Amino acid sequence: MSALDGYTDTTASSLGGTVGSAGLIQKAYDRLVEFELRSQPLLRTIVDKRPAQQAMPGSTVSLQIYNDLTRTTEELDEIIDPDAESVATPEIVNLVLKERGKVAMSTIRLGSLSFAPVDAALANLIAYNLADSVDKLVLDALLEGTNVRNAGGGVDATGTIEASDVRYIVAKLRGNKASGRKGSMYWAGIHPDVSHDLRAENAGNADWRAPHTYVDSANLYNGEVGSFEGAFFVESPRLEATDGVYPTIFCGQQALAEAVAIEPHVVIGNVVDPLKRKMPIGWHGILGHAIYRDAALYRVESGSSIAD
């Protein structure tokens, strides 16, 4: 053993000792334990239709939409009054409320022996899981929409989104009389992989506008990357692919409805075990989602040139 490492050599009988056994030199751990990379909650922000005058609590909340009267273009007779026209039955949208939640558990032993703070980490994990789970419920409801365009004319992952797809859907939404969500522009949720293809195809196109050129920064959606052909695009990895096919969702006002009996919230459970060692924390809510105006909802299904 050289004089240089006589006190720290971990393979000899030194004061440093052996890592993992006796000795003063051991592995060090950073007490700050990082969380996984996370996507930001996004999709629930587009819900803009909720019950306004709910009559009573119930397991299903029914919303109704009047049907307009037919146009009249005939001239009235001077003497004979027109026949009264019966008004059609309103359309009905049913929102089924379901109970949702998740629970995690901390113990006195875990908190006492852990090198990192456990309770704060569990609170963070539960709060994110709440937002993440509710956003997935919203996405599942949006994917029930019946208006679908397949990029490239196919139904697999080979076609990539193009400007013509955006123009087609914006035209259809306007033809359906769907109201825009930012002036006359429609909201478009897009995965970054798909956004890459659309922006690469239209690089240098003056019709692609950066967000700051059409809206005050205070009114930007999280992840908003620009507007193009009548829609403003918001990137989110939450719009992930299934079997290589990504959904890009376009919607106007009142595309999706939400009813809430209990707003999802974090719950600190009661400590009920005899020695008060187990401390539950979770989230709980009762809510439901459904498409309210299918005419205000479209999606493009496409692959991506940079998909994994």
State where each predicted segment sits.
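Hydrophobic alpha-helical segments involved in membrane association or supramolecular assembly
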Residues: 63, 188, 277-281
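Long, hydrophobic/aromatic-enriched structural stretches that serve as scaffold segments
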Residues: 82-128, 132
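Structured loops at beta-to-helix junctions and adjacent beta-edge loops in soluble globular domains
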Residues: 56, 64-67, 107, 191-193, ...
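Assembly/oligomerization interface modules of large self-assembling protein complexes
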Residues: 37-100
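Short helix/loop capping segments that flank catalytic or ligand/cofactor-binding pockets
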Residues: 71-74, 105, 114, 197-201, ...
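Sequence/fold signature of self-assembling virion shell proteins
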Residues: 2-47, 160-167, 200-308
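Extended, solvent-exposed, turn-rich assembly/linker loops in the middle of proteins
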Residues: 146-221
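Alpha-helical scaffold segments that mediate packing/assembly in large oligomeric complexes
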Residues: 110-179, 299-308
